[in-house]
Amino acid sequence: RDHLRCQPNGEKTWMKLQGLVYGKHMHGAEMMPGVANFFLSCKIRNHRVFIVSHKTEYGHYDPEKISLRREALKWMETKRFFDPEYFGINRKNVYFADTREEKLKKIAQLKCDWFIDDLPEVFEENRFPSDTKKILFGSYEPELFHNTTILNSWRKISEKILGQTTDKDITTWANRMMEKPIHHIEKIAGRGNSKVYKIKTTSEDAYALKQYPNLVTDKRPRLTTEFNTLQ
């Protein structure tokens, strides 16, 4: 973003790109690693999740006039945000704001305990509610921001807000990947930053589940390497 905006006509180019990415090509977007697990862990703890987005109805310079808000909701629907058997987020808990000021008012109105954003400008506003704890997502210098937690992965965000991963978390995540109900889960020794669990289903089938370090912060292809070794 910053690189584009520094170029000649950079602001216009950036706005055009935003219109394409969040409009016509929104269907191709994927969730960040760790987001799905975070939402599932919020659900089993009965935490309410709100999505408050500063998003205009249409992209700038978009001749097709594709509704960015409608595309965002369609994408969330596809990713099962509103499915009560999955993330279970209430569709009414999604808010779109025309301006940053409107976004800040909505955050204050909802009395959020935490708010996560990847734009520093949101937290630098004097009108940001003082009772809401801030998490800035990304790689920023902590000393540049007052009273703001800076984290660069959703696993770290989950640990900050929800605490350490529990067996119930692991069971919930595994249930979304497997067709068989889980009977028992046991943590066994893991090496380094990896965590290994033994899972038994109700039909007595046994599986190993391994949780690797986040690829966002650790680029080593550990899963691929181990899989190739086993072949």
Question: Can you annotate each of these PLM segments?
Answer:
Residues 63-169:
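C-terminal cap/substrate-recognition subdomain and adjoining C-terminal extension
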Residues 56, 120, 141, 203, ...:
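Short, glycine/serine-rich, charged loops/turns that create anion-binding
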Residues 178-201:
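ATP-binding glycine-rich phosphate-binding loop
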Residues 163-186:
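Juxta-kinase regulatory segment immediately upstream of eukaryotic protein kinase catalytic domains
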Residues 2-40:
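Metal-dependent phosphoesterase signature
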Residues 207-231:
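A conserved alpha-helical element in kinase catalytic cores
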Residues 26, 35-76, 97:
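Substrate-recognition element of Asp-dependent hydrolases with the DxDx(T/V) motif
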Residues 1-6, 13-16, 83-93, 180-185:
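Short, surface-exposed acidic
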